[in-house]
Amino acid sequence: ALTYREMAERDSTHLNFILQYISECYSQMKDTENYVNTLREGFTRYPSFPFFYPRLIEYYQNCNMNDSAMAVTDKALKTDSTNINFMLTKSTLLLNRGDYAESLYYCYNILQKDSTVADTYYNIGLIYFNQAIEIDKVRQTSAAKKRQMENLYRQSLPYLEKYRAMAPEKKQRW
C-alpha cells in the first residue's frame, strides 16, 4: 500500500482517508516515527476528521508527552471551540496537571452543551476529590482545613455517583 503513497496522495478529494490508511499501515509495520508523523500531517490538514486527533493524544499520553498533547488540543480547540471531545480532553489534561479551576471551567461548558457526557461528571468529581486528597496529605491540618477537606469530599460524591450511574460498565474507575 505504501508503494503507491505518492500517487494516492494526489487524490485530494480523499486525502483524509488516504492519510488514515497510510498511518494504519505504519502502525501495523510498527514504524512509530512515520505513524506519528502521518497522524500529525493528517491532523494539521484535517483537524476535525475523527481519526487523527484521538490517536495523537493517545500516543502523547502513552509517551508521557503531556505538553505535546496540550498543544495539539489547543490547536484543535482553535479550529472548533465547541467540540465536546476537544473540550473534554482539555479538561482531562488540565485535571492531570492539577489545574483544577481551569479544568472545572471546561467541564461546566461541556455540561451546558450536553449533560449526557459521563466523563465530564467523572472529571468534576475527581477535581474535588483530588483537592481533598491534597489537604489530607498534610500531616497537621487545622480544623478549618479538615472541614474544607470534608466539604470537598462531599462535593465530589454526587458527581462520582452520577458518573457511576451513567457508566456502570467502567467499574475500574469507580
Question: Model features per residue range: what roles?
Answer:
Residues 29-30, 62-64, 96-98, 125, ...:
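Short coil/turn linking the two alpha-helices of tandem helical-hairpin repeats
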Residues 14-15, 49, 83, 117, ...:
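Residue-level recognition of tetratricopeptide repeat
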Residues 18-19, 52-53, 87, 121, ...:
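Canonical tetratricopeptide repeat
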Residues 7-8, 41-42, 75-76, 109-110, ...:
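Canonical positions in the second alpha-helix
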Residues 21-22, 55-56, 90, 124, ...:
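Structural register within alpha-helical repeat arrays
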Residues 10-11, 45, 79, 113, ...:
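Structural marker of alpha-solenoid helical repeat scaffolds
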Residues 129-162:
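Short coil/linker segments at helix-helix boundaries
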